Amino acid sequence: VNRLGKTRTARLAAVGVACALALTSCSSGSGDSRGDDRATARQASAETTTTSSPTTSTSSSTTTAASGVRIVAVGDIACADGDRTTSTSCRQADTARLTRSLDPAYVLALGDLQYQNGTLAQFRSSYDASWGSLKPITRPLPGNHEYYTRGASGYYRYFDRSAPGYYAWNAGRWRIYNLNSNCDKIDCAAENAWFRRDLDRNPRRCTIVAMHHPRFSSGREHGNNPSVGRFWKVAYNHRVDIALAGHDHDYERFVRLSPGADAQPRRGIQSFVSGAGGKSLYHLGTRKRGSAVFKASVPGVLVLQLKRGSYTWKFRTVDGRTPDSGSRDCL
């Protein structure tokens, strides 16, 4: 190749990188113990983490080559219109205000977005009044409360999406899978086969899998969900980096775990429960193996900064604090 050819090649490569950072594309698809064990402690020490630090400023840059792509991930959000607001319930307007101040590129909405029954009228009267301005950047998935309306029709109509509700999309260099974990309502065997195929087609990428029901949770109301183990096994075998869920109304971070809850710092999936989106807050139940941080006193959202080969996380609360934060490299 001559000098001119090399120059043109370099310019095309630069353009390709810029486009990859700027664009997103989607594809659709029809043993517990209390406290942390020593393996958990060793893994936690390998992470860069900070807890209980106040936050005084927010960067307005959502997507740059240096900072990556900023995503807010949260579920369990809006009370029915007219329900009484307290310090710990019906705070959807406050979590929406916090999210707008964070200026994310995307909102990953983790299900149970509109209580009690997820009807279209409820979505329009409550969720839309608080989180509606964020709808253009929202990438939702359904929770169990969406199915309190037959076929989750209110959810699908409000977000202009189609059943069965699982799909993949790109955020910068990351691949993100929004799954439907309501396996009593859809064919999760077919979904899992689609999930496996798409992971096979996208090797060596930093990856997130998101669903409403968490594989692991210390929340008293629900706790662990073995039913989503099928998704975790596929994710683990393909070296998925992060698992996100809601369902329990709290914030919880786990160290990297196998589908069987073994701490695996160099191989496991790091999971977060981010269900403190406004509806209400639950209490701590039995602390599950691998649980590193549990917070359930103030509503808030999980903020992820997805970079090339790494990520950072922050749990931001509506009172302006950051009770948990840290960073990790991808697997």
PLM segments and residue spans:
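Extracellular mucin-like PTS domains
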Residues: 41, 45-64
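Bacterial N-terminal signal peptides that target proteins for export
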Residues: 2-14
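Residue-level marker for buried hydrophobic side chains located in beta-strands
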Residues: 71-73, 107-109, 140-141, 209, ...
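Extended active-site neighborhood of metal-dependent phosphoesterases/phosphodiesterases
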Residues: 82-86, 115-207, 222-242, 250-307
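Bacterial signal peptide processing site
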Residues: 27-30
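N-terminal active-site segment of His-dependent metallophosphoesterases
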Residues: 63-122, 185, 190, 197, ...
